[in-house]
Amino acid sequence: MAAAKSDPHSYVLPIAESQRIFDRDIVPAELGSLGSSKTTDGNIKPVAVFVVGQTGAGKTRTAPAIKVVMQSHRGQPAHFIADTYKTYHPAYPRLVVEAPALASPATGTDARRWLAMAAEHAIGRGIDVLLESACRNPADFADLAQAFHDAGYRVEVAIMAVPEGLSRLGILTRFYERLPEAGSRNLPPRLTPTKVHADSYEGLLDAAVFVDESSAVDQIVVVRRDHAVAYANERVNGSWKRAAATRKSLMEQRDRCLPKELSIARKDIENLRGLAIPELPPQLEEIESLLGPLMDENNNTHAPPLRLLVLPDIGVAGHSYDVNLDLTLGTIADNQ
């Protein structure tokens, strides 16, 4: 068998083949059981909820909590995980085995195309959507959010605010300790390359700027791994209730490490060192250097207070609430 080609661009599929795979494989697997919109109240828009964060930030644990609430109030949403579309590429299974570092870049172009096609499919049927993305290509996030907005959807966004050292450590921990989030849905367990993490870490800042400056997003929450909220805002009649500060909040929280997070990080580093894997010590030293400045307790002196994420109560009927929701998840009609 010939060796895998090294040029990622050589794996991009012709448009016709890409469309066939979408129709034959992706629609039945990702969208086939959802039908069309179950919303009968003309005052309530379909909703698209984005959970975005760099690789290793903790999206795999945050998104399910949001999905449960969406299911309770509106029924099953389409759940799109951007990375999983790579597995539909015919070259992906071989590349994962023979050239793991090539698997993602070689299949990424088609995966991004399929994600956009899945979103278009959902929009055409008014299906609610929950979408997870690492924002390595922030323009994709912006395009998708704008597409949902232009189609009449309510767009809500949760941005994961996680320090660089913690998300890099999270990548190593989930892989070497074989945690479930190492392989989202039908993805095999994977060790995300450092450059991919760096790209998504930077891309998230661009996504935050888009949220602040675009009219496409109706509600935003900046949240940490433990569902602690640092910033929340909502548009009313096209304008933010508060000064737009998504990017500012994201940057502030990235420079802040909570005591519980540090305690867990120290234990994770100790456990990984105990595995005696030759390539780990240099990476752990880098991570410790990233976390070092955050271990100073004085860093948190002037940080804004955090509070728990507020979502609609599961099982509570109706659209009126006595508290301000960080994400309404489309449960509140526009005229209320």
Regions found by a protein language model. Give the residues of each.
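C-terminal accessory extensions appended to soluble enzyme cores
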Residues: 1-44, 205-336
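Short hydrophobic/aromatic beta-strand immediately N-terminal to the Walker A/P-loop
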Residues: 49-50
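The conserved Walker
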Residues: 54-55
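Conserved lysine of the Walker
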Residues: 59
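Hydrophobic positions on the alpha1 helix immediately C-terminal to the Walker A/P-loop
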Residues: 62, 66
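Conserved nucleotide-sensing/catalytic segment adjacent to the nucleotide-binding pocket
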Residues: 72-149
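Switch/connector loops and helix/strand junctions flanking conserved nucleotide-binding motifs
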Residues: 87-90, 164-170, 229-232
